[in-house]
From Swiss-Prot:
GO molecular function: NADH dehydrogenase (ubiquinone) activity; NADH:ubiquinone reductase (non-electrogenic) activity; quinone binding
Organism: Klebsiella pneumoniae (strain 342)
Primary gene name: nuoN
Protein name, entry field: NADH-quinone oxidoreductase subunit N
Free-text function comment from the UniProt entry: NDH-1 shuttles electrons from NADH, via FMN and iron-sulfur (Fe-S) centers, to quinones in the respiratory chain. The immediate electron acceptor for the enzyme in this species is believed to be ubiquinone. Couples the redox reaction to proton translocation (for every two electrons transferred, four hydrogen ions are translocated across the cytoplasmic membrane), and thus conserves the redox energy in a proton gradient.
Keyword Phosphoprotein recorded: no
Transmembrane segments: 8-28, 35-55, 75-95, 105-125, 127-147, 159-179, 203-223, 235-255, 271-291, 297-317, 326-346, 374-394, 408-430, 455-475
Length: 485
């Protein structure tokens, strides 16, 4: 197989991030310098983002039988790169107070970003599995990065064992699907799964096992039990990556899989996915009601957000708007989560033991950090889906798609879930404006808005507000990002 210059250009983001991994590795071996390695990582991720413009000029193509680079792959690659950049930016001040080796953190984030980029363009079950493993394996190390904290170590062990189990389910499911159809590429699977074979027990068993594996990675009920513990135990910058990059990349590839394989035509699969979505929305919101730890609360809320997205996935066969709804929703979810976790990261930096993640740490924050409180309030309103924020546009899209596909019980679940969610998001927002406690246990640095992490948080808040009032630029970008059929 010969690779043409066009194919090399199409692979630019993947190649640049891969090269950055090698450069950072050599740089660590040569001399440990936190600032140098952080800068190299951020430069590499920025270069990969810029290279997307050249990829766009190049047009859509199948680079190898496993990777398809089209507008859809570019959109999700961009979102993963933004999330990875934000993670590195939040990690820098946090690592300043960290006593052990700091530089490997960036290495692990870059390798995970590589997995996310691979998933965005995956067109083959082998690429899907490789991408998921490339994202998961570095996360084992990242979740336990603050290994002197018992919580962090426990979270890492839980995530490692459960993730390995989920991967084996996924692999076994793929093996059964392959045994039934003789193909691994999404398109060929779609052709061989024309409606007549969708009732064969072997195939349904394979799809069921794949749903278990993917449901774990997306933390959908009932495969969600690791989520709150891991979000709470992982350092704040790592929770940012877990909540954004890994969820977005994996949901992106599942969306493409369902688009090419008409699985949604099978009544059994639709019912199972519908029940999972319903349970995720209701359970995620109900469990978040009683949380006093912000990272746990955001962990439970991410379960419900994935439930909302699943509604759009189930409605995929009934129209074009599902792809658009998912793109807009994920962009809104990305910026809102980056802002919320960014505030927690700023409050927790530099590293000095546990993160500032208890709700009590944020009481009365407004009276000494007014702008930071305003940012956190905007993020909470956006995650709750209040009008004038980007979160509302995404919610509205999901509801519209559900109504269009006549999924009435799921639309009702989304409405009820959003109403429950309003309570706990506003609880966080209100606590920022209460009277401050006598002695502060944690606080953000006084010049936080001039730090790189502060700038990322402010830009996220600005985007959530501006795109919430005028979403057309985002909608246009998402409409361009159609997968090559």
């Amino acid at each position: 197989m010969t690779i043409t210059p066009q194919q090399l250009i199409a692979l630019l983001p993947l190649l640049i991030v891969g090269l950055t991994v090698v450069v950072v590795m050599l740089s660590i071996a040569w001399r440990r310098n936190h600032f140098l390695n952080a800068t190299l990582s951020v430069l590499g991720l920025n270069a990969a983002l810029v290279s997307l413009w050249f990829v766009g000029q190049n047009g859509a193509m199948d680079v190898t039988p496993m990777i398809r680079v089209d507008g859809y792959a570019m959109l999700y690659t961009g979102l993963v790169l933004l999330a990875s950049l934000a993670t590195c930016t939040f990690a820098y001040p946090w690592l300043e107070g960290y006593k052990d080796n700091k530089e490997e953190f960036y290495l692990l984030v870059l390798i995970a970003a590589l997995g996310g980029i691979l998933l965005a363009g995956a067109n083959h079950l082998a690429a899907l599995f490789l991408g998921i493993e490339l994202i998961s394996l570095p996360l084992f190390g990242l979740v336990g990065y603050a290994f002197r904290q018992k919580r962090s170590l426990e979270a890492s062990i839980k995530y490692t064992i459960l993730s390995a189990a989920a991967s084996s389910f996924l692999l076994f499911g793929m093996a059964l699907v392959y045994a039934n159809s003789g193909n691994l590429s999404f398109l060929a699977l779609g052709k061989s799964l024309a409606d007549n074979t969708l009732h064969e027990p072997l195939l349904l068993a394979g799809l069921g096992l794949m749903i278990v594996g993917l449901g774990f990675k997306l933390s959908l009920v009932p495969f969600h039990l690791w989520t709150p513990d891991v979000y709470q135990g992982a350092p704040a910058p790592v929770s940012t990556f877990l909540a954004t990059a890994s969820k977005i990349a994996i949901f992106g590839v599942v969306m493409r899989l369902f688009l090419y394989m008409p699985v949604g035509n099978s009544e059994a699969v639709r019912v199972v996915l519908g029940l999972i979505a319903f349970a995720s929305i209701i359970f995620g919101n109900l469990m978040a009601l009683s949380q006093t730890n912000i990272k746990r609360l955001l962990g439970y809320s991410s379960i419900s957000h994935l439930g909302y997205l699943l509604v759009a996935l189930i409605a995929l066969q009934s129209g074009e708007m599902s792809m658009e709804a998912v793109g807009v929703y994920l962009a809104g979810y990305l910026f809102s989560s980056l802002g919320a976790f960014g505030v927690v990261s700023l409050m927790s930096s530099p590293y000095r033991g546990p993160d500032a993640d208890s709700l009590f740490s944020y009481r009365g924050l407004f009276w000494h950090r007014p702008i930071l409180s305003a940012v956190m309030t905007v993020m909470m309103l956006s995650l709750a889906g209040i009008p004038m924020t980007l979160g509302f546009i995404g919610k509205f899209y999901v509801l519209a798609v559900g109504v269009h596909a006549h999924l009435w019980w799921l639309v009702a679940a989304v409405v009820v879930g959003s109403a429950i969610g309003l309570y706990y998001y506003l609880r966080v927002a209100v606590s920022l404006y209460l009277s401050a406690p006598e002695q502060l246990n944690r606080d953000a640095p006084s010049n936080w808005q001039y730090s790189a992490g502060g700038i990322v948080v402010l830009i996220s808040a600005l985007l959530v507000l501006v795109l919430g009032i005028w979403p057309q630029p985002l909608i246009s970008i998402v409409q361009l990002a159609t997968p090559l059929m």
